Amino acid sequence: MLFRSKYTVRLIDDLGYKDVMSQTGSKTLFVANDEAYEKFFKNNPWGVHSYEQLTDAQKRVLFNGAQLNNAYVLEMMSNASGGRKNLSLRQESAAEAIDSVKFWRPEELPVNYNADEDEKKYWKRYNSGASKGIYMAIDASRPMITHFLEGNMREKNIKRSDVAFVLNDKDGWGESEATRAYVFDARVNQADVVCLNGYFHVLDKVLVPPANMAEVIRENNDTKVFSHILDRFSAPFYNDVLTKTYQARYSAAVDSVFEKRYFSINSRSGRLQTEPNEKLPNDRIPLLPYDPGWNAYQLSSSVPSVEDMAAMFVPDDAAMTDYFVSQGGRSLIERYAKKPNTKENLLENIDQIPLDIIQALVNNLMKNSFIETVPSKYYTIMNDARDQMFPPSQYPSEAAYKAVFTKTLMANNGVVYVMNRVISPADYAAVIAPALYNSNTQVVRTVVRADDSYIQGSDYSRAPLKQYFSTYLKAMQSRFSFFIPEDEGLNTYGYVDPASMANSKNTSNFRYFRFRPGDTRGVGGALAVDAWPVTYKPATGQQPGDKIMNGTTYASPANQELNKGMGAVKRSLLIEMVNHHIIVHGSDDTKGVETAQKYFLSRDGAPVIVKTSNRGVGMEVNGGFQEQLEGTPAAYTSTVKEVYDLTRETNKGYGNGKTYILDRPMQATTVTAYKAIKDHTQFKKFLDLCTGMSTALLEKAGFNAPFLVAGADDAKHSGWLKSAAKYEFFVRGESGGLQYNVANDDRLVRLFNNYRYTIYAPTDAAIDAELAKGLPTWDKISDYLDTNLQAEVKLAADKSNQDEYDRVNKHNDAVKAKAQAMVTVLVNFLRYHFQDESLFVDQVSHTGDYATACINEQTKAYLSLSVTQTPGQLSLKDKAGRTVTVDGTTHNILARDANFNKGMTLITSSSYSVIHQINSALLFDGEFAGGYAQAWSSPKKARAFVAKFRIKD
């Protein structure tokens, strides 16, 4: 297989491929004529001016890098394996990783000026000191060839103008022009020349396969700053295969050959988080989304490397200088730099920015799909907050978008778009930013970023928390108030473990945890936070002088897996704490917590109470636990020490709220709704009605009849027990197939379902008023049944007593029908006082309809209450049209129904509620304004009523 070009022939001869190219086989070559070579020698990236100046390595690049180890006609190159048409964008070349091995002089190697001793300087050994220089490949995977063929372009919606732009073709490529094909940036002039052992395709220039994106960025003259930053994520790794291959090929006395790799989520060996010469991963190393030096880059395990490549949006040096010296990145330099913020000090100053902070800038500019980021699809390119990276308001047309770029750089694993500006990540503009920047917020930073590198594909199952807090807090269309307890407060005052209080009446077992930044020491599934237990004394609360418990029984060091021992408790408490400190406001709410309103709901429904009129630095905020401690020696508040305004109104339209640094964390109440109601004696009769039901009474009333097997008397049928549970209100243990784990003397509201609620608790006087109108009690229903039910008659074998049998059954059916109506009235009466959503007596004005726990079976709709909030007052309108106003003194009682795991060591789910006293009860049916007996005035009416208001689970 020969092409009539002396340079191609010389390459074949010099590299020893004459016999290979002369034999039958399957090869594809991309070749250029002699004229193209003459032009190449006048201008090329290697600075060689004649064939004789080419090194053997360069010859291999020119020949092997333009060769495929299969025979392809041009049209078939876009087909993927298995006959899948038009899916291939790339092909694996015949080049080898060994071809890129060279001796790197010290001045060619990355330099890290960071002064923090904790940041490893992986290159220092080779760019200074005794061991200067290194033999290294820029990657150990086989280089690939990218081609632009119209079949693949049509399949992937890539326009000709996209390809022209990527190839820096100023003349363009119109849709009406002739078909073209490109291999990298070389145009195919003649395709499908047949040889005995394959095909060759003639190009319009000598094909010099580009390096990977990281190397292309490094070599480009005006992306040096970004390359410098990128290389902080890299390290040299010894490669035994490369070493032995290099020694054998060159007979060289080279002890070690390394490869340059980047710490990343997606690399040729999967997640690369293990440092050179180490065996265990270091989860404190910030990761790039993928290795930009990976020649054979693969988007995911389900997308073969031939079907796509990556893309990077890299600011040029001028843009990077402006950004850090005088624009958006200036604040980072001012916070971290050691030297004056000047162009001359730029690299040294940038290197002082912690790696996990600068990571956000780099990752935001790295996109995992070239196909989805071509210019014609610019409006679908998303930033780290999943917002448009190039919004139409700033880039109204494709032409305006393209004007951002000074050039494009073709690499063997992607395309680099060189920009004249820096696009800041949402990390720098969102409420999460202060958690990342502040040196005293490492615990919260660790928690909110714990899942960041587990977003892609199946990695979700490996995320330590599975909460993705940072993704949530970067929702730029939302508005947040984010409270961040600082490390000092978490280490001094800690966070109370509610399970320890629920699990024992012995206060000596009560504890709180002090949280500190820690080190996982490479343990997978751990979290870099230490949790040290301290005995909680209710009389004094959390005090700086409290001693950490002896032993490790209740401790959870940072290197403990979160699914083992107290690791699960630590995980649960930290998730709860962060959720409790996030408030989500309406999209048009520009003031957040800085209004006259006092009560706010956190992300998980826990109330946050603003205690002071001051709404900036010095503002005091409480959780329910702090409210329950008021007036005791253990009382405390959380005080705001710093405020960061990150609203879009003050940040050029891109922001999502305010961040408040707290001296210590808030915490939710440990009082259940049952305990809260029980502790207020004026609600005794309401509580008695809620707890007076018995399964025996329901069976006596005949509710279990549908579950009885014919010919049997099995009142304990499992289906019946599950059905009977829906009549309960406060439960403990098993109920209706669900488990409610709570302290022995406590109960949980069965109607609650991991949400937020309001309970309107009628006073005893209010209940008495309804009883006087005929509202039944459980005792009265039981007495009615005992008094009116007749002894059952067994039908004789000869049916001689048929009349008596029928009479008794008819009588008892009527009695049971009325009793069932009484039960249905009572249960719905009580349920109507349990409402979805937590509403407070507060300085707000709002009117709305809110669902209760009652349902109208005919309309299939939950019955609602019309609620009106005015400053200092909350009024209700029930289904009877009556207005009931919440008591002006006893209201806003906070409760949390926490359901613990079987071992009572951590909370598995919880519902928050606020309880208000009402001095008149609420009616779920307007017909009851004059009395309740009409619901069971006849068996027919009783059955109709039960059908309409049947109790649903």
Model-identified regions with their sequence ranges:
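Mature, structured domains of secreted/extracytosolic soluble proteins
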Residues: M1-D953
